[in-house]
């Protein structure tokens, strides 16, 4: 669990960095990053990062794939420009826009391998802004680079988790062999012994196993 949390926090930092860089490069006031969550059935699109918005706005915000401007961009896989979000029927966050003084918006899709939609990048301005073709091309380029960066980061995290899992299994297996020899137990009995020690001491099985290996080296 701790490794999963750590990996999530690492990805969260990458998401935050993306929106900060996009906002700085493009000169927009607010940038938000939404990513497709395919673990849901049907899939949803979730807000992963934004800047200059109250933290409570970000917590567990998700939309259906065909809902709002985010869903529109995700479904059509095409950029969307809105001159005034308060006048846009499909824009769902009018209360938030009024509160923050947001006016114009441009949304572009994040396309992954083989053109598969992986998310949406939304950019807002606090004054009326006519997003030009140059603006959209820049946002599209940045969005595609972000999609690659996110995918590469996910692969790195997955690799690290697999490596840690293999290391954990190997350590527990070695500890189990030591307990089998010391106490003349079967493999299953030794595993249950380690698990009970873990529960009784409120330590993880890897911590108990590492302690067993250390004691074996000392004696």
Model regions and ranges:
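Regulatory sensory and allosteric helical modules in signal-transduction proteins
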Residues: 44-46, 55-92, 98, 106
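Allosteric cytosolic regulatory segments
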Residues: 140-147
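Amphipathic alpha-helical coiled-coil segments that mediate homodimerization
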Residues: 1-5, 10-33, 69, 193
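The cytosolic transmitter module of two-component sensor histidine kinases
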Residues: 7, 11, 15, 66, ...
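Short beta-strand-to-loop transition segments that serve as allosteric relay/switch motifs
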Residues: 52-53, 119-130
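Signal-transducing coiled-coil/dimerization helices and immediately adjacent hinge/linker segments
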Residues: 155-218
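GAF sensory/regulatory domain recognition
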Residues: 19-23, 30-61
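A short, aliphatic-rich beta-strand micro-motif
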Residues: 103-112
């Amino acid at each position: 669990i701790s490794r999963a949390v750590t990996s999530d926090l690492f990805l969260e930092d990458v998401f935050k960095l993306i929106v900060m860089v996009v906002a700085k490069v493009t000169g927009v006031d607010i940038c938000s990053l939404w990513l497709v969550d395919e673990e849901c059935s049907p899939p949803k699109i979730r807000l992963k990062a934004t800047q200059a918005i109250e933290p409570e706005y970000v917590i567990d915000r998700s939309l259906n794939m065909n809902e709002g401007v985010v869903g529109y961009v995700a479904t059509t896989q095409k950029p969307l420009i809105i001159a005034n979000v308060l006048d846009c029927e499909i824009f769902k966050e009018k209360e938030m826009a009024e509160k923050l003084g947001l006016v114009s918006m441009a949304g572009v899709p994040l396309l992954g391998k083989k053109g598969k939609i992986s998310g949406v990048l939304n950019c807002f301005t606090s004054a009326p802004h006519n997003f030009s073709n140059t603006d959209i091309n820049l946002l599209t380029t940045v969005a595609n680079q972000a999609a690659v960066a996110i995918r590469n980061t996910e692969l790195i995290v997955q690799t690290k988790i697999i490596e840690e899992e293999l290391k954990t299994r190997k350590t527990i297996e070695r500890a189990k062999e030591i307990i089998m020899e010391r106490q003349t137990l079967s493999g299953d009995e030794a595993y249950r012994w380690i698990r009970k020690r873990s529960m009784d001491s409120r330590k993880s099985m890897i911590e108990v196993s590492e302690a067993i290996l250390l004691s074996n080296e000392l004696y």
